[in-house]
C-alpha cells in the first residue's frame, strides 16, 4: 500500500523531497519504496514502462540491454520514436483499417523498422515497443469513431508471452466503448512456427475469445512456415509484399494467392494484400478475389498530424482506376 502511494505520487509529478516532507519519512525510505513499487508494477503491467524514467526500471543481468537498446529505450522517453499510419482499403478505396508502423528519429536521421529491429535482443525492448504501439492503437480507437480497425504488429519473441496477454487486456480496459475491442487487430508474423509454440496458439485463441481480432502477416514470404490450419483460425491473412510482386510473372505465386483467397472465402476470413503500388497489381489481385489492399497506390505511411485527413480521404468510395 505504501509503495502504491509513492508510485501514484511519482506519476502525478511529485518529487521525492516533496513526498518526504508531506509524509514525514526519510528520502531513503521513499526511494526504496519507489524502486520496489516500479519493479512490481512493470512486471505485472509492462505497458506502463514508458511512464517511468529508465533509471527506475528493473534490470535483469541475464537479459541486459545492449547499448543500442538503451538508446532505443531513452528515445521512447524522449519522444524520438513516433508512429506512422498506412490505410487498408477495399476495392472501392473505402477505409477498412489502419496499420500502425514506427519510425525512430536517431542522430539526425529517421530510421525505418528494418534498420533497427534486427538489433533488438532483450524481451524488455520488445515489450516496450509493443506497449508503445498498443497505446497508440487505443488512443486512436477512442479518438476516431467508425468501424475501421487499427492493427499492431506482434514480435515473434512475444507470441507465447503472458506479458502480451496482460498488455492487451490493459489496452482493452482503456477503451471507452467495450465494443471498440473489435477494432483492435494484432498481426502475427507467419514466420512463427505455431506447431512448436503451443502456447502461442493458445494465446491467439484466448485473445480472440476476448474479442480481439488476429491476423496472420507475411503469408508466403521467403521465410514462410506451415501454420496449423486445422488448429488455428485467424480472422484475416495478409499476403507478403514479395509474393504480390512475384505474382506479376510467376504462375506458382499466382496459384498460391488464389488458393489463400479461396480459403478465406470458405472460412469467413479476410485476405489482405500489402505492397500494392500499381494499378496493374491492384487489378490482378482484385480478379483473384482479394478485397483488401494496402500499399503506395493508395497512400504511403503518414505521420499522426495527417491521420484525420487520411481517414476523411478514404471515407468516400471510389475505384482506384477512376483517379
Model-derived regions, located:
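Charged helix-capping and loop-helix junction motifs
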Residues: 165-170, 198-202, 251-258
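Helix-turn-helix DNA-binding segment
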Residues: 1-35
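Basic, Lys/Arg-enriched C-terminal extension of HTH/homeodomain DNA-binding domains
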Residues: 38-67
